[in-house]
Amino acid sequence: MTATALTATDLCCRRGDRWLFSGLSLNLARGEALHVLGPNGLGKSSLMRMLAGLLPPSPDPVSGITGAIAWDGPLALMDERHGLDLGQPLGAALAFWARVDGPVPDEAINGLGLANLLDVPVRYLSTGQKKRAALARLIGQNAPNWLLDEPLNGLDVAACAMVERMIARHCAGGGACIIASHQPLGIPALTRLDLAEYAL
């Protein structure tokens, strides 16, 4: 029997006077990748922040019951905030986080095309290069559960393929991953969750 990475039940999200989604439940097993999709404004980023524990679920608009989220093991979140010191060379910026989270494996540095950028100040990196560096930092956290919010934004076709390979490798090794993206994903055995089905 495959171990469960995440169980979430009856998640609802209200921002101000607007309900984004309601009644969302999901289970994620080890080795699985889930693609959360839907147009902008439906609450993809809000769901990711909720799953990361940064945003509390809203009480159900009918029952008043607040949903629950249970992870098996640590999780790591990657969103638009890369957290890298703009004034430092990339290698030094990653080394800072390595002292906090753990070192980034050379395999990840090479697989994400960062080996030739380690001496370049972060401020001079392109959006796509910073995105790949943020993924390298996430890999260094050695968490079994990944939350990736729009990881392909700003990436060219080759870089998208790099990121997809890293996600596939993580899941093949027993990790679990939830990816919020409006772009198609080329990841084996990917399941999908359309937030439009839970919109109010």
Question: Which ranges hold each PLM region?
Answer:
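Hydrophobic anchor residue at the start of the ABC signature
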Residues: 135, 174
